Curated annotation (Swiss-Prot):
Binds multiple chlorophylls and provides some of the ligands for the Ca-4Mn-5O cluster of the oxygen-evolving complex. It may also provide a ligand for a Cl- that is required for oxygen evolution. PSII binds additional chlorophylls, carotenoids and specific lipids. It is a multi-pass membrane protein. One of its GO terms (cellular component) is chloroplast thylakoid membrane. The gene is psbC. It holds the Pfam family PSII. The modification N-acetylthreonine is found at T15. The modification Phosphothreonine is found at T15. This is Photosystem II CP43 reaction center protein. Residues 1-14 form a propeptide. HAMAP family: PSII_PsbC_CP43. GO terms for biological process: photosynthetic electron transport in photosystem II. [CaMn4O5] cluster binds at E368. It is found in: Plastid, Chloroplast thylakoid membrane. Signal peptide: none annotated.
């Protein structure tokens, strides 16, 4: 029987395109992969694969710079960021660039600089990618052994892993240095409704606090790491993570894999791809929850309110209105017999009544000043509500992070809601969807890598398929 596949490929793929189509000298006959398989043709060409990765980085950075400048060009300072469909400027504002008290944007020049720097960087990466893809050596092992590798070389692979971990650790410390030494970061919890820049002076480095987040429940008021609500803990956590990544990187560079790791793991290019996709899927799912629920790392001034925040803001807004109209908010009953404005949680805490009771564990900068030791404080609700709290809750009430692809956002029953989709909705949904696809990719490539390692990568022998021994359907 004529062999349908190259000995170098893992399993046969029949394609409408025959092997005569050559792309840059890397055709199906020599690599076992058709042109549309992309970088799979470069599995054993480390120099060309480097070019593909550098060019890919250039495309990513180009998008970041171009989209950054596009958002700057369309930005209207008088409107909140979350009403303008912005997904990049909120990140820059969170780092404290260009913002004043209350999250008001007072200078867009830093955003312009960011976009231009990314465009310049993308040009450098683009030239590097083109050079290595077209002109540079096909393989690096002979000319530049430090940068060369063989996929099955376990020691080299863990060295590369170590270098990546060190780079990630340096990235974590960049945020730490920004918060400590280079102007600080935006603090949504500053008194009076947010502060433009606050240098962090009292880092949380206690391991019991930092790692305590990991031991919290995922559910209810616990909220795992997503429940972090002060900058000291966030920046302190980056000190810990950066240190762990850097020391872990040094460890992986200096050591060789233990025997159990050599036995347990599959050591091939496709296996490393599957591990990476699995890790990215986990990151995507965590980021989805973080963006959706956390209003400290993702301040509501820039990203719009969280879902629970918009709901509690609605309850607060109508409490303020009806209290002014003479309602006794402490004792008024709702249609179910529970408190209309205020009620007690099962643990005795005073919380907002009505449907928003499910979001009793919300913490938000505009609401916390009205809490006492047992939840919401009735005397503070009667005497201490400030105009900025009323304005902010009314704004957040009409900007719930709900919406669909046709941009009908806001709560459908609220006549003053705005037609928009919140950046929170975009960012959390996109990270969930991409995380899911990456997880599927992880399963796919893990299955292929394990099959190749086990030696049955060519699929089931068609002569012995179970279906052949079964009776016909009719």
């Amino acid at each position: 029987m004529k062999t349908l596949y190259s000995l170098r490929r893992f399993y046969p793929v029949e394609t409408l395109f025959n092997g005569t189509l050559a792309v840059a000298g890397r055709d199906q006959e020599t690599t076992g992969f058709a042109w549309w398989a992309g970088n799979a043709r470069l599995i054993n060409l480390s120099g060309k694969l480097l070019g593909a990765h550098v060019a890919h980085a250039g495309l990513i950075v180009f998008w970041a710079g171009a989209m950054n400048l596009f958002e700057v060009a369309h930005f209207v300072p008088e409107k909140p960021m979350y009403e303008q469909g912005l997904i990049l400027l909120p990140h820059l504002a969170t780092l404290g660039w260009g913002v004043g008290p209350g999250g008001e944007v007072i200078d867009t020049f830093p955003y312009f600089v960011s976009g231009v720097l990314h465009l310049i960087s993308s040009a450098v990466l683009g030239f590097g990618g083109i050079y290595h893809a077209l002109l540079g050596p096909e393989t690096l092992e002979e000319s530049f052994p430090f940068f060369g590798y063989v996929w099955k070389d376990r020691n080299k692979m863990t060295t590369i892993l170590g270098i990546h971990l060190i780079l990630l650790g340096i990235g974590a410390f960049l945020l730490v240095f920004k918060a400590l030494y280079f102007g600080g970061v935006y603090d949504t919890w500053a008194p009076g409704g947010g502060e433009m820049l606050r240098k962090i002076t009292n880092l949380t480095l206690s391991p019991s606090v930092i790692f305590g987040y990991l031991l919290k429940s995922f559910f209810g008021g616990e909220g795992w790491i997503v429940s972090v609500d002060d900058l000291e803990d966030i920046i302190g956590g980056h000190v810990w993570l950066g240190s762990i990544c850097i020391f872990g990187g040094i460890w992986h560079i200096l050591t060789k894999p233990f025997a159990w790791a050599r036995r347990a793991l599959v050591w091939s290019g496709e296996a490393y791809l599957s591990y990476s996709l699995g890790a990215l899927a986990v990151f995507g799912f965590i980021a989805c929850c973080f963006v959706w629920f956390n209003n400290t790392a993702y301040p509501s001034e820039f990203y719009g309110p969280t879902g629970p925040e918009a709901s509690q803001a609605q309850a607060f807004t109508f409490l303020v209105r009806d209290q002014r109209l003479g309602a006794n908010v402490g004792s008024a009953q709702g249609p179910t017999g529970l408190g209309k404005y205020l009620m007690r949680s099962p643990t005795g805490e005073v919380i907002f009544g009505g449907e928003t009771m499910r979001f009793w564990d919300l913490r938000a900068p505009w609401l916390e000043p009205l809490r006492g030791p047992n939840g919401l404080d009735l005397s503070r609700l009667k005497k201490d509500i400030q105009p900025w709290q009323e304005r902010r809750s009314a704004e957040y009430m009409t900007h719930a992070p709900l919406g669909s692809l046709n941009s009908v956002g806001g709560v459908a029953t609220e006549i003053n809601a705005v037609n928009y989709v919140s950046p929170r909705t975009w960012l959390s949904t996109s990270h969930f969807v991409l995380g899911f696809f990456f997880f599927v990719g992880h399963l796919w490539h893990a299955g292929r890598a394990r099959a190749a390692a086990a030696g049955f990568e060519k699929g089931i022998d068609r002569d012995f398929e179970p279906v052949l021994s079964m009776t016909p359907i009719n």
